[in-house]
Regions:
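ATP-dependent carboxylate-amine ligase
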Residues: 1-137
Length: 137
């Protein structure tokens, strides 16, 4: 679950759902940004950020704007990723926030298209490997 590349007949998945910090999120988003196809970042909360929670998530929002076409954020704190992307002028039709991974899974087929490159990254406790399993079914 650390930068594992999964290619199936629908999409390419970059599974990095094991751990997350602002630096590792930015690094993973830069890798996503190198791809030519439409890029989707599925990003969950980063835990144990303390008083830096909002700032750290906003840094990720800026990096997402620079490296992706669609942002899907999951979790309470990931709302700051979305807010930063909106503040920077990212197309609001391509910003989606869900409170839980289950809510995201309900909508994911509408948001992810054939041949997309999809990054899945969050702190381990978010259990976003369930999203990877769903996308790879």
């Amino acid at each position: 679950m650390r930068l594992d590349i999964i290619k199936n007949d629908k999409m390419t998945i970059i599974n990095d759902a094991y751990n997350a910090s602002p630096d590792s999120m930015e690094a993973a988003l830069k890798i996503l940004g190198r791809y030519k196809n439409r890029k989707v970042a599925i990003l969950g909360d980063m835990f144990e950020m303390g008083e830096h929670t909002e700032y750290g998530h906003r840094l990720v929002g800026k990096s997402a704007v620079d490296n992706t076409d669609v942002i899907i954020a999951i979790g309470k704190d990931s709302k700051f990723i979305c807010e930063e992307a909106k503040d920077l002028g990212f197309n609001e039709n391509n910003i989606h926030h869900f409170n839980t991974k289950e809510e995201a899974i309900e909508k994911i087929d509408e948001l992810v298209k054939k041949d997309d490159v999809v990054l899945v990254k969050a702190s381990r406790g978010m259990e976003l490997e369930k999203i990877v399993e769903y996308l790879n079914k």
